[in-house]
């Protein structure tokens, strides 16, 4: 965390990280002048410095200070601790040798290292896989073999070191969250803390490859020179931007490289048609299949000395100036896979490269079954990015940039933000893969939290879709699935019973306002037609207020149910029958007003059948419930 804080402050304050120190453990409340007084006896002999920034740390009851030297400082002479007030102050800095680690922090994106059957089987006659403790204690000669495996093993299957190197690498590269043992060159004590803090951010270590590590391997030595030529040409594409001092060009980038042996290409051109397609199961043109594919991570270091120069080119580089030497030796790491399908180790590396291509959003859906086609399809696309073609050691190299680190950031930050690749407009419409950026305007958006939210939303959508299909398998409603109609129908079915009672009561209240506008005509067919709605009304209404029997006919011949209607209310069927008889002879206002008081509710219930219920029967039922109005007098 302290090293990340140092890098963040240097970036925000435009301070050279190699000339800066981070001092932690400063007591709270100490002023800047007091801090400078404590630091001067220790740091002033190293060079002129100034205190640029101080801030209290959130998780600690202490402050941190950023110190900047005017000139380059000898990091070996910087003490780790400075005696100060209320304790010891710790000092951290970024060594130039640590910058190569940025190229080794890509395994989370580049490698999906898991045991394969071919790797577990190994080669007959080889020793078993050494444990993690033995991997750490290996001498420098064994370390050379481990580092060389990341550039791809030699194609000769008779070499016994090949399987051992791959298995050793698998022990070293484990997933984040598990205790891992680092192979390769042991880190110095000055680099151990930064090694832990930065490696945990991505969970992987990828050893950088130097020419000295490949001194005994002719094939890999030539491969190193070829990949270095590709990295050098890619770096030169941004040389004009960096020369202006604006540092607009990215310092680190990820590229896909194909290497083709010119002599083998000429032999392939002389072969009869169909021979290449039988040897290699792919639909690519026989002249378009390279000998190997590499995923290359390059870091431009214009301000730094090269870690290890190529011994074969050291004589020629000594005569050139320092800038040319640094430009001709960019730092890089690579994962190499040969295209020969008969090599199980090559297929393992090809699958890893294909997984990276897919995670970056460059692969097509139709090519996912064939890893080689999936990788080669990227080279045939118009990426609108930097692309170079060079020849080195009798090999043709074609390289295209897949991912850049923007805003003077490093590749680790670029990978962490999962920025979308620079695709042309027509390619952006196509699927860019799961890890492609889903922001149209900000290419660096789309972190891990957004990715988890997207995955959760997709899973929830699938679950809801499946549950909806199962729910509608035996449904009674014939509505289009997924439409608004099916939702409304489902809600209507659930609220059917409750809405009946509410609608009946509401219709009774409205009937009083419309009673003077309706007219009732007493007839036997109308009485029979309106009998069913009233019977239903009697079943659903409260027992204490609802009549129990059916109303009689106009002639008084109907029979009532046991118990009668309107018990204790002074309303009898005879009085109602007499009221209906007088309504046919007299058109007085009292007959219309009181005889049709409850006709509105049952008129709506019989509208669907084109019938209007009589007013006297509806009025009788309503009055029996309310119990307030007296029946009309018979004349």
UniProtKB/Swiss-Prot annotation:
Region of interest (Disordered), ranges: 115-202, 260-332, 492-635
Polar residues: bias regions: 133-147
Gene: PNMA8B
Biased composition (Basic and acidic residues): 261-273
Regions of compositional bias (Low complexity) in chain numbering: 541-557
Protein family: Belongs to the PNMA family.
Identification of the protein by name: Paraneoplastic antigen-like protein 8B
Classification via Pfam families: PNMA_N
